[in-house]
From Swiss-Prot:
Family per record: Belongs to the group II decarboxylase family. MfnA subfamily.
Its job: Catalyzes the decarboxylation of L-tyrosine to produce tyramine for methanofuran biosynthesis. Can also catalyze the decarboxylation of L-aspartate to produce beta-alanine for coenzyme A (CoA) biosynthesis.
Protein name according to UniProt: Probable L-tyrosine/L-aspartate decarboxylase
Signal peptide coordinates: none
This protein's pathway: Cofactor biosynthesis; methanofuran biosynthesis; Cofactor biosynthesis; coenzyme A biosynthesis
Enzyme class, first EC level, given as a word: lyase
Keyword Lyase on entry: yes
């Protein structure tokens, strides 16, 4: 650190130089995040100093968090939506705002483990969870942090988790199952209704990672079942900072009942509240304000239009790609496309180096992974496909 302070002009010149090194979303087709809505940005600024880790000092920010949990509970068909954070909610859905899907997934499995430890089920060995091969890498962190064995079930021909594989991996030490509602690589939705049945039959917890799909699936023309409407679903992760158009970081974790939240409780005797249920201590009240503001501003109608627009982009991409001879691995159910192209690694490299397009690659099979977000336009899609044609004609 410098001895003498710099001027504002020097500081902002320095910051602008750093900002110029960042990638603008203009030609990004690989990210599940996007520009936050302007009202979310303004709300974030208004509550920039609010710390939800000390709720008694920031009652207003705390109330906004409660409202977000309530709105998300309504969206995801929770048993009850009027639940004060940390309050009494014995037969109602509870939750809190997290930094994103990784924290939500960690906390959901931590809750499973704690409830099993204090419950009637006796394990004969290390606890395990069964997840799809398509699950997010955050579950690798779960295994490392908590000493939980992670068993990976294979996928079917449509890149959804295979039910027979799930059932074959369950044993006496299994504490829970994971379902994905919008997997990162293919945008596919696991058969959550079937997972719900298996979870109930085996008395297992079922956590749904809907970090991306949570703000997409409810607004599709033909939504698939994935939320608390299914009786076996015990927790759901959803990220407002993705298709919810809030500021980063803004995630959320909802539980079906208070017992899950209570299993995460630790005493905090020197704060204005007696206990915390969260993973992090200090938490952003600004994120709560941003999420509350954008959800109230857009409403169901606004989010429906947002999803319709992204699905229009998705359809446009598939149509234009077919014109130059490239097919998707499967028909997209969400705004994620896996496109079959020759030598996808080379294509990815060339699209970035020559035209500035940021795309990614699926693992198995290897294909171009493209995410169509609100920052993209129909014109972007036409230009992208023309650039793709120019790159692939040389292979």
């Amino acid at each position: 650190m410098n001895e003498q302070g710099l001027s504002e002009k020097e500081i902002f010149s320095y910051l602008e130089n750093a900002k110029s090194e960042d990638t603008d979303y203009y030609r990004v087709l690989s990210s599940m995040c996007t520009h936050p809505h302007k009202i979310a940005v303004e709300a974030n600024r208004l509550f920039i100093e609010a710390n939800l880790g000390d709720l008694g000092l920031f009652a207003g920010a705390s109330r906004l968090e409660q409202e977000v949990v309530g709105m998300l509970g309504e969206l995801l068909h929770a048993p009850s939506i009027d639940v004060p954070f940390g309050g009494s909610c014995e037969s109602s859905a509870c939750g809190y705002l997290t930094t994103g899907g990784t924290e939500s997934n960690i906390q959901a499995v931590r809750g499973m483990k704690n409830l099993v430890t204090t419950g009637k089920k006796e394990l004969k060995g290390a606890p395990n969870i069964v997840i799809p091969e398509s699950a997010h890498f955050s579950f690798d962190k779960v295994a490392d942090m908590m000493g939980i064995e992670v068993r990976r079930a294979s996928l079917d021909s449509e890149f959804r988790v295979d039910m027979a594989s799930i059932e074959s991996l369950i044993d006496a030490n299994t504490i829970g199952l994971i379902g994905i509602a919008g997997n990162t690589e293919f945008g596919q939705i696991d058969p959550i209704d079937k997972l719900s049945e298996i979870a109930l039959e085996n008395e297992l917890f079922l956590h749904i990672d809907a970090a991306f799909g949570g703000f997409v699936i409810p607004f599709l023309e033909k939504p698939q079942p994935f939320d608390f409407k299914l009786p076996g679903v015990t927790s759901i992760a959803v990220d407002p900072h993705k298709m919810g158009l809030s500021t980063i970081p803004s995630g959320a974790l909802l539980f079906r009942s208070a017992s899950f939240l209570d299993s995460l409780k630790v005493n905090t005797p020197y704060l204005t509240t007696k206990a915390q249920f969260t993973l992090t201590g200090t938490r952003s009240g600004a994120s709560a304000a941003a999420t509350c503001a954008v959800m109230k501003y857009l409403g169901n109608e606004g989010y429906r239009k947002n999803v319709q627009y992204c699905m229009q982009l998705t359809e446009k991409l598939v149509i234009e790609a077919r014109k130059i001879g490239f097919e998707p691995l499967l028909e997209p159910v969400m705004n994620v496309v896996a496109l079959k192209v020759p030598n996808p690694d080379f294509v990815r490299e060339q699209m970035l180096e020559r035209f500035g397009w940021n795309v990614s690659i699926t693992r198995t099979p290897r294909a171009l992974r493209l995410v169509l977000m609100p920052h993209n336009t129909l014109e972007d899609i036409e230009i992208f496909v023309q650039d793709l044609k120019e790159v692939t004609v040389e292979i």
